[in-house]
Swiss-Prot record:
An example Gene Ontology biological process: sodium ion transport
Bilayer-spanning residue ranges: none
Highest taxon, organism lineage: Bacteria
Name of the protein described by the UniProt record: Na(+)-translocating NADH-quinone reductase subunit A
UniProt similarity note: Belongs to the NqrA family.
GO molecular function: oxidoreductase activity, acting on NAD(P)H, quinone or similar compound as acceptor
Organism of derivation: Vibrio campbellii (strain ATCC BAA-1116)
Amino acid sequence: MITIKKGLALPIAGAPSQVINDGKTIKKVALLGEEYVGMRPTMHVRVGDEVKKAQVLFEDKKNPGVKFTAPAAGKVIEINRGAKRVLQSVVIEVAGEEQVTFDKFEAAQLAGLDREVIKTQLVESGLWTALRTRPFSKVPAIESATKAIFVTAMDTNPLAAQPELIITEQQEAFVAGLDILSALTEGKVYVCKSGTSLPSSSQSNVEEHVFDGPHPAGLAGTHMHFLYPVNAENVAWSINYQDVIAFGQLFLTGELYTDRVVSLAGPVVNNPRLLRTVVGASLEDLTDSELMPGEVRVISGSVLSGTQASGPHAYLGRYHQQVSVLREGRDKELFGWATPGKNKFSITKSFLGHIFKGQLFNMTTTTNGSDRAMVPIGNYERVMPLDMEPTLLLRDLCAGDTDSAQTLGALELDEEDLALCTFVCPGKYEYGQLLRECLDTIVKEG
């Protein structure tokens, strides 16, 4: 067992009951283009086209052959683009059950399948995009290979679902997915989990590793740091446990599996719980009649690292397994910094809230102040369990010093790995965004 001591278990109210319920009927689904780092689409459809489930919607010019497919059958009603014609979303109005089918196999055949057969089926179904590289968090090139695939079978994000509940429902598919991953690499498949028992693969190159501790103990970046440190030469791939289930279902049934169990939670959710929905689901549909009155912010993903779901982006992200909702913190409090703060959380214990052990806080979107200088008072070191110098790294990101940032470990990280640093930063810096700018510069400069 690898125990993480540094980090933060965010004491936020609105945790979900760990029972899976059926979500509301989803009328619209979407693929969000900006989730895929560096992707430039070649469109295969236009507004008004009827599409089948698993039909190709677009391909990636920058990553030849990688296909992005429809999560449901229906009619393309929107293709949204932003500045410089960046693809924001392709929206489908759900209708019908038509779908593209694929080859299916017996469970005993999967581990012995040829790697090219597996790759072809994953690419054609669109499930290849469930894999992400580290460094850079991109969809892997089709002809690339890796010595390490990390399965994130735990979740320490605030308000998250317990993965074992979902995996237990789909044991055969989960094991089948692990067998497929084992055949996809000549190296190892690292299944990273909490202390709970999970169904396991019998393949010799599939290893289980137990992690314990506060967030970010459940992130792929943390697992890689301790088991297979990555750099420009050592590239690892990662995948979440629900996509492993989707891999297994694809090969066992010959059909694209797009079901997704998400946590709908937060201080302003009427009944926080786990809901069964689909990849790319409209969050307007999913949260209908579920939220308390007032101005709220719906977030696809974690409150720490998720994306605001509004307008063309109001859909469940490809890599997200929770929907978090916070009240918009627009109310200003006169001399708020001088009050005792019984109902306020602070990592530096600046308020009385820390005295009441186990207290949960109705957190909002407020940053409690305006932007200011980055002040190194030890906050970053409290929440960074990786063996690196966070203050120096974050300063380099602010300054745009890519060479020094690489030396200090920037290539190991993804935006979610710095989310806690953003949360505890007294200067209100968005370190995930700065990291992405740094990584993009490194890619451009070769």
